[in-house]
Amino acid sequence: MQAPPPEHCPGVESENAGKGSACSGCPNQGVCSDPNKKLEDPGKALVVESMKDVKHKLLILSGKGGVGKSTVTSLLTRYLARSNPDSNFGVLDIDICGPSQPRLMGALGESVHQSGYGWSPVGIEDNVCLMSIGFLLGSVDDAIIWRGPKKNGMIRQFLSEVDWGNLDLLLLDTPPGTSDEHLSVVSYLKDDTNPESLRAVMVTTPQEVSLLDVRKEINFCKKQNIPIVGVIENMSSFRCGHCGNTSEIFPAKTGGAVAMCAEMGIPLLGSLPLDQQISKACDSGEDLTTFKNVTSEALEGICSKIMASIS
């Protein structure tokens, strides 16, 4: 019989399974350390129970830092919620060391409350809620210096101990790369009986230095059997507010996201411009989707494709 996992369990998928400091004294240690005896992470059953009313999960991935994953996550959430008022949306910030969503969603200074059903996520709109480790810190300047097992334990708590309620879509803002956080969240959320319930959206900028890492992220999803909804090319162009001319800040010398999507057989969802209004809205936590501009027009097409893919 499996025992409940210790607080900082590295997870059975981790190379530290059965070997970490948290494993000492755990009744499951012998099972986890033996590749021939490994059982399903006992924490997964708790996650499955907690997430049973969350219909769809969408990983926002990139591979490269600085391409705007967090910004795109907040923009998608805001636009989806505004254009689908009868649906409920959640955001989970699993960028443990660099949580950005509290600022982007205008929720700095908010706190998480405990109820009989677990942590209550912070309400952003009537149909949007948010959970981030940023709400658990004493100061926005506090550094989180954690190794993989502790990060994995935090992610497991977010998935199993937060009262998400009934959600039509949960968007997960992820850190760059294919790190412990990615392996952990995929192992908990992937449902072999319903593989379409967990999907991914890739975010890239046009230049090859970003596309190189996004290709790796696409291959990660293929190896993990995670369906990819498509790719969003962020900061694709810049339109001058004075003269109206459009220029490429990050030239697509190898064809940009268009060429990569054709090469790898992945849909291109659309392109978002480098927009000064986005920058201002990110710092202030303002909802940019209330403005009618080139960004909101691009979001309309992107969000329509996302909703169609999960319908």
From Swiss-Prot:
The GO terms this record gives for MF are: 4 iron, 4 sulfur cluster binding; ATP binding; ATP-dependent FeS chaperone activity; iron-sulfur cluster binding; metal ion binding
Residue ranges of the region described as Disordered: 1-20
- Cofactor binding remark: Binds 4 [4Fe-4S] clusters per heterotetramer. Contains two stable clusters in the N-termini of Nubp1 and two labile, bridging clusters between subunits of the Nubp1-Nubp2 heterotetramer.
Look up the record and name the cofactor or cofactors this protein needs.
Answer: [4Fe-4S] cluster
Q: Name one GO cellular component term.
A: cytosol
Q: Does the keyword Glycoprotein apply?
A: no
One GO BP:
iron-sulfur cluster assembly
Lyase: present as a keyword of the record?
A: no
Binding sites annotated in the UniProt record for [4Fe-4S] cluster 2? 240, 243
Binding residues annotated for ATP, in chain numbering: 63-70
Record's keyword terms, sorted: 4Fe-4S, ATP-binding, Cytoplasm, Iron, Iron-sulfur, Metal-binding, Nucleotide-binding
- Binding site residues for [4Fe-4S] cluster 1: 9, 23, 26, 32
Family the entry assigns: Belongs to the Mrp/NBP35 ATP-binding proteins family. NUBP1/NBP35 subfamily.
Complex formation: Heterotetramer of 2 Nubp1 and 2 Nubp2 chains.
Q: What does this protein do?
A: Component of the cytosolic iron-sulfur (Fe/S) protein assembly (CIA) machinery. Required for maturation of extramitochondrial Fe-S proteins. The Nubp1-Nubp2 heterotetramer forms a Fe-S scaffold complex, mediating the de novo assembly of an Fe-S cluster and its transfer to target apoproteins.
Entry protein name: Cytosolic Fe-S cluster assembly factor Nubp1 homolog
GN (gene name): Nubp1
